[in-house]
Each structure stands twice: as structure tokens, then as C-alpha cells.
């Protein structure tokens, strides 16, 4: 997957997430405003009925109701954020699983180059079974021989290499997605919600 394709995919996912999150946030804000207005209305009614006697209690009650409304608002927003982020990550996982939007051979070349930086002479390479023909071609192009190719359905794609003495570099899509997750979550939080 080249940088341009990654950027296009990233932009599309961000745009979809932005639209969905704005809609969810608008609805949550309307609901929060309604709850706060209702709380303030209740407070005013109580204050008018027993002006001096209950004004202190009414303010405390109003504050509790407003605090609860704000808490519910924060919960709603947090759920909306989590939902949007999970949908983005799920879409990325689907695209990786189905090999949508990128060149698998180029992807494997780049991942192998990165892994070879840490282990120059791997003895084993673990791949998704669908990538067998691609990795054979890549290994041949790089002049790498005597490497055991192990197929595993436990990885979406990408590769894991191991040295003869047990050193391991995990450059599988699963691991890269997890590594990217914390970075993406922080970036999405800033982009979508300004925090």
C-alpha cells in the first residue's frame, strides 16, 4: 500500500467518522440541553413555591440534576467516540483482511525490508496462507534463501520473521494495527473532538 493510497484511505475514514460523529454529537447536545432546561425549569418551580424555605435545597437539587445531565452528556459523547473509532478500526481490519486498496506484494516488500533491518538473516517467516505466492516472489527478488515459510491463519497479513536463535520481528497487519490504534485514537480524538 503506497503512501498516497494510505492517505486516501485515511482521509475517507476520517471524513466518514467526522460526519457520523457530528451527527451523534448534535443529537447528544440537543438531549443534554433539553435535560438541563428541564432541570432548570424544575428548580424555578420549586423556588417559586416555597421561596425562602426551599431555595437552598432547590439549588442543591438543581445542581444535582444538572450534574447528572452533564454526566449523561459526557457518557453519551464517550459512547459516540468509542463507536466511531471502533467502526473506523473495524473498517481498516476489513480492508486489510480483504486486501482492499493496496498492493499486497508491495506491502510485503516494505514490511520485509523493515523487519530485515532488525534481523538480517531470518530462518523463518510466518505469513497468512493467502500471501504464500507473493512472499515467495518477494524472497526470490531479495535473494533470500533457506527460509522456512510457515502459514498461519492467526495473522490477517503482513509477516513475522524469526532468526535461528529465536529473535522475532512481528510486522503482521494485526500487530501494526494495534500499534497504530493508540496513535490513531489520539489523532482522531483531536481531529473529531478537539481534545
UniProtKB/Swiss-Prot annotation:
Gene3D superfamilies reported in the protein's UniProt record: ATP synthase, E subunit, C-terminal, F1F0 ATP synthase subunit B, membrane domain
Superkingdom assignment: Archaea
Biological process according to GO: proton motive force-driven plasma membrane ATP synthesis
GO function terms (MF aspect): ATP binding; proton-transporting ATP synthase activity, rotational mechanism; proton-transporting ATPase activity, rotational mechanism
Predominant cellular place of this UniProt entry's protein: membrane
Keyword RNA-binding on entry: no
Compartment annotation: Cell membrane
HAMAP family documented for this protein: ATP_synth_E_arch
Subunit structure: Has multiple subunits with at least A(3), B(3), C, D, E, F, H, I and proteolipid K(x).
Name of protein: A-type ATP synthase subunit E
Record organism: Staphylothermus marinus (strain ATCC 43588 / DSM 3639 / JCM 9404 / F1)
